[in-house]
Amino acid sequence: MSTAAKRRLIRDFKRLTSDAPIGISGSPNPDNIMVWNAVIFGPPETPFEDGSFRLTLTFTDAYPNKPPTVRFISKMFHPNIYANGELCLDILQNRWSPTYDVAAILTSVQSLLNDPNPASPANVDAAQLFKENLKEYERRVKKTVELSWVDNADEIEAEVVEADEGSSS
């Protein structure tokens, strides 16, 4: 692994933990600093409000000169998010700059939730609903929010069961 990439990711983690933007959290995988798990909470007063959306960020040795691959693990309904969870976001493609850190990436993703770009759709159905039937789009997004609760509840339940099994041995 590139020492420069590792050093930069450690610096990004320190910044994220000491000065985290509201509604965002993230940390490296304990076994691999090049893979991060993150959570973005839906911005207030948006259809995504109250949602808790999980993502992964996968970095290469070329970071920060090349952007990470960012992918939602949570099911999403959004004009700029592909079915596999990957994003169509300019700063992760043609507008990337090495000055962006993990906090900036996650903040941009959070902003994208409320401010989609239907002109560059990754999900044509979501883009069409957003442009032509906002009420139905918001209804579908609210279902996604409810699914995010179940996603996280399953994960929490699995951790509790694992902890219980570990304490009984």
Curated annotation (Swiss-Prot):
Enzyme Commission code: 2.3.2.23
Q: What class of enzyme is it?
A: transferase
Span of domain UBC core? 4-150
Active site as annotated: C88
Keywords, comma-separated and alphabetical: ATP-binding, Chromatin regulator, Cytoplasm, DNA damage, DNA repair, Nucleotide-binding, Nucleus, Sporulation, Transcription, Transcription regulation, Transferase, Ubl conjugation pathway
Q: In which pathway is this protein known to take part? A: Protein modification; protein ubiquitination
User: Which example biological process does GO assign this protein?
Assistant: sno(s)RNA transcription
Transmembrane annotation, as ranges: none
Q: Which reaction does it catalyse?
A: S-ubiquitinyl-[E1 ubiquitin-activating enzyme]-L-cysteine + [E2 ubiquitin-conjugating enzyme]-L-cysteine = [E1 ubiquitin-activating enzyme]-L-cysteine + S-ubiquitinyl-[E2 ubiquitin-conjugating enzyme]-L-cysteine
Provide the Gene Ontology terms for cellular component.
Answer: chromosome, telomeric region; cytoplasm; HULC complex; MUB1-RAD6-UBR2 ubiquitin ligase complex; nucleus; Rad6-Rad18 complex; RAD6-UBR2 ubiquitin ligase complex; UBR1-RAD6 ubiquitin ligase complex
A Gene Ontology molecular function term for this protein is:
ATP binding
One Pfam family here: UQ_con
Lineage top rank: taxon: Eukaryota
Q: What does this protein do?
A: Catalyzes the covalent attachment of ubiquitin to other proteins. Plays a role in transcription regulation by catalyzing the monoubiquitination of histone H2B to form H2BK123ub1. H2BK123ub1 gives a specific tag for epigenetic transcriptional activation and is also a prerequisite for H3K4me and H3K79me formation. Also involved in postreplication repair of UV-damaged DNA, in N-end rule-dependent protein degradation and in sporulation.
**Recorded family membership:** Belongs to the ubiquitin-conjugating enzyme family.
What is this protein identified as? Ubiquitin-conjugating enzyme E2 2
Q: Which organism is it from?
A: Cryptococcus neoformans var. neoformans serotype D (strain JEC21 / ATCC MYA-565)
The gene behind this protein is UBC2
